[in-house]
Structure formats: C-alpha cells, structure tokens
Amino acid sequence: FTGATSVARHVMAAAAKNLVPLTLELGGKSPTIISRSADVASATERVAMGKLMNAGQICLAPDYLLVPEEKEGEIIEGLKAATAKMYPTMLANPDYTSVLGARHRERLEAHVEDARAKGADVVVVNPANEDFSKQNTNKMPLHIIRGATDEMTVMQEEIFGPLLPVRTYKAVDGAIDEINRRDRPLGLYWFGQDELE
C-alpha cells in the first residue's frame, strides 16, 4: 500500500486479520529548510518545482518550508517568480496538473480556510490572474501559507497538493528542533552552501 498513514492503519488491520503479507509506503510531512547561506533564486526554483510537479501530489513533495525570518519575504517572492516562470498560465496549461478530484480539492480548500481563520496570511500564486472558480478540472494554484502554526490542519496532516506552509526560524538549531519534534518525515530537503550548517 502507498498512501496516507490514516488509511494505512485500516489496510494493515485488514491484512493482519487475514494474515496477508503487507508492505506500506507512507507519506508524511517532508520539511524543506532554506538556510541563510542558500542561493535564494536557485532554492526557490527547486522548491516550486518539487511542490508543483503533479500539483504536489507526490509522496516526497516538500510539505512545509522553514526559512530564516529575515529572508521570508525574499523567499516568498522567489517562489512566486519561479512559479510564474514554470507556469505563466495554469487553467489551460496541459503541463499544470489537476488535483485528484473534487473531494480532494475541497479538502485542500478546507486547509486554506482553516489556516486563514487561524491567522495565516495566504498568498495565492496565480500568474495570469485566472478564475479558478469557473473550471471543471480541479486545478488549484499554489497557495503559500505564511505564519502557519501547529493548530492549523495544514500543519497536522499530509497535504498532497499545491499548498505550502511557511514557518520562520531565528537559528538553524530552531529549524532542526522543529523537525525533530514531529513524526519522522519521509524526506527532508536542505538548501544551503555553508558546510558547517
């Protein structure tokens, strides 16, 4: 089985009940750290590509971003520029993928609304200012969620879509502590040029 931990529990219980051998590949919240020594343009281009490939519906897609607090604005702008370069349009662009279906899109939209209601600043990256409300393809633009907190569902569940929570850190140790206090991620991404970090 490949998929979410919550579903895997049911699959594993059914397999155990029937003594069926099982291998599980589970997703998780794969963090991405951009360090102070990173080339911001290069890092944000790679993060945007990783997050938007298949509309973020890849088990190893970056799930949240940890950035130095003084570089947050520059990094957000880099993500916007990288997205616009890859996908100047999205709705009619065959290279920009839809999410799995209406139910999945509604789940992602609920994460966005929950984050807004709990104080996040949501930046919708829509380079051509297209109207996504009048489409039947279940496409969603990138939503950057600034100020994401642990109370928000977007930080509690695997996203599997084009939503990117951003949290800031003062010191690299704080970013590492942030990762270590959570469940073990499936993947982790680091962007930086300082070997001591």
Each language-model region and where it sits:
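Short, intrinsically disordered, charge-balanced linker/junction segments flanking boundaries
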Residues: D194-E197
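Conserved glycine-rich beta-strand-loop-beta hairpin in the small C-terminal domain of fold type I
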Residues: T137-P141, E157-L163, R181-L186
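Short catalytic-loop micro-motif centered on adjacent basic/acidic residues
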Residues: F1, I33, G187-W190
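Active-site donor-binding acidic/aromatic loop of nucleotide-activated sugar
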Residues: P165-R167
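Cytochrome P450 core scaffold surrounding the K-helix E-X-X-R motif
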Residues: E151-Q156
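ALDH superfamily catalytic-core signature
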Residues: G3-T149, A171-D173, D177-E178
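Bilobed periplasmic-binding protein-like "clamshell/Venus-flytrap" ligand-binding domains
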Residues: A120-V124, R184-G192
